[in-house]
């Protein structure tokens, strides 16, 4: 497949740069964009970078992005990477504000892709704010073909930022786009872990405050999709706990050992 991708806004420190909170949008969205590109290319797809770093205004940036996007033919999906703001929760309230994906309308393949991306980011521990239609955004309105805009998480919410890691965020986005689990072939890891304690609770979210939905026994092996921290900084792994595709389990990394 063919994709275009870009990180929104000018770089940090320039006019019309992204939101600034506990982290900076224009720094993080470029890191996420680069990693999504790497993963899509790893799976054999063609990806064009349409990021603009020299815009003179918000509208000029969007115009230049759209011009780049529409210069390529045969594109299956245009991807715009952003971070949200407006939560105003820099101290943290143990509840993250979450993720959402924006589309111009619900027609075509982009809508289901957007839902998958939301679900994948939700698996990292973020609140799923869902897919929303926005008809006033230039990159969605004026691009040719299917397009979506990912609002990864909120830069001004401590709980969002505590969970955030650009690599796990990018992996979730790439997996949502491709509708597959991406496992990189390395000599050191196959993503398989064995349980080291007698009984390990499986929860429906990252953190001990979440409901216990089952348990694993010592010696059980699982394939972990990704690790991310809870609001206390403890690492939790997500995995497919049952044959029900809607059931995602979370276990503490402290009681797992990698199988090499």
Predicted features and spans:
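SH3/SH3-like beta-barrel superfamily modules
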Residues: 215-255
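Predominantly extracellular/luminal cell-surface or secreted proteins
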Residues: 203-205, 240
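Short alpha-helix capping/helix-loop boundary micro-motifs
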Residues: 206-211
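Extracytoplasmic/periplasmic beta-strand context in beta-sandwich domains
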Residues: 129, 135, 198, 235-237, ...
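Solvent-exposed coil/turn segments that connect beta secondary-structure elements
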Residues: 8-10, 84, 106, 155, ...
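Active-site-proximal helix/loop segments of hydrolytic enzymes
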Residues: 3, 14, 26-185
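Short glycine-rich His-centered loop
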Residues: 1-22
